[in-house]
A protein has these predicted regions:
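Enzymes and membrane/adaptor proteins characterized by extended Gly/Ser/Thr/Asp/Glu-rich
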Residues: 72-110
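Short glycine/serine-rich loop segments
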Residues: 104-199
Length: 199
C-alpha cells in the first residue's frame, strides 16, 4: 500500500485516514521514500526534515485514532516554497545573502493556516534567488529539473514546488505567484496550480 500512497490526492488520503485504510505515518513515509529516490536527480528540495515530519504524522495518527482530526488537512504531507517563513527552518529565498542561522521563530500566514489544519509539513522547495525569474536555478541550490525531462526546466519561480508534485514527492505544495510563479511551473510540469486572489 505504501507505494500506492504517493499516487493519492490529498482528498483521497483524507478518505483513507477516515476509513482507517492508511495512516498519516504510512503516507509521510511513502513521500519521504519517494523524495530519497527521485530528488537526487530533480533537486526540488532545499530542506527535508524527516524527524519533524514523522513526529507530526504520529500526532495526526493519534488524532485520527481518537476520531478527532485537527482540521481539513490532518495528516496530509505538504511542502513549502522557500520564500515563506516556516518556524524552526531557515527561509533563504534561494539566496546566499540570507544568514541561515536565524532565528526562525514564526510561520508565514499560509504556513500557519495549513499547520492549524494538521498538515504534515515535511520540507522546503527550491526557487530562483528572490523569485526573480521564471526558471528554477540559483547559486544556493543549483538547477531544479523537470521530472518529465531532466534536460528541461520546471519553470519558476515555484520550481521545486511544481517539480515535487509532478514527481509524486507529496500531494500538496505551497508556492507563491506575483507574475506567473505558480502558473508557469504548473504549465511546464502538468500539475494543477492555483494563484489565489489578493485581499
Amino acid at each position: 500500500m505504501s507505494d500506492e500512497l504517493i499516487y493519492k490526492s490529498a482528498k483521497e488520503l483524507l478518505g483513507l485516514f477516515q476509513r482507517k485504510e492508511a495512516s498519516p505515518v504510512e503516507a509521510i513515509r511513502a513521500v519521504l521514500e519517494r523524495v530519497e529516490e527521485r530528488d537526487k536527480d530533480i533537486n526540488a528540495f532545499i530542506l527535508v526534515d524527516e524527524g519533524s515530519a514523522l513526529a507530526q504524522a504520529r500526532d495526526s495518527e493519534a488524532r485520527w485514532s481518537n476520531g478527532n482530526p485537527k482540521g481539513l488537512l490532518d495528516g496530509v504531507p505538504i511542502s513549502i516554497k522557500d520564500m515563506f517563513l516556516t518556524k524552526g527552518w531557515p527561509t533563504l529565498k534561494g539566496s546566499l545573502t540570507i544568514d541561515p542561522k536565524g532565528p526562525w521563530e514564526e510561520d508565514a500566514p499560509c504556513v500557519a493556516r495549513v499547520r492549524e489544519h494538521g498538515a504534515v509539513i515535511f520540507g522546503k522547495t527550491t526557487m530562483p534567488e528572490f523569485g526573480w525569474k521564471g526558471v528554477g536555478d540559483c547559486e544556493l541550490t543549483g538547477i531544479t529539473r523537470n521530472p518529465w525531462n531532466l534536460d528541461k526546466t520546471p519553470g519558476g519561480s515555484s520550481a521545486g514546488a511544481a517539480a515535487a508534485i509532478a514527481a509524486r514527492m507529496g500531494p500538496l505544495a505551497i508556492g507563491g505567484d506575483g507574475g506567473g510563479s505558480i502558473r508557469i511551473p504548473s504549465s511546464f510540469t502538468g500539475v494543477f496550480g492555483i494563484k489565489a486572489n489578493y485581499g
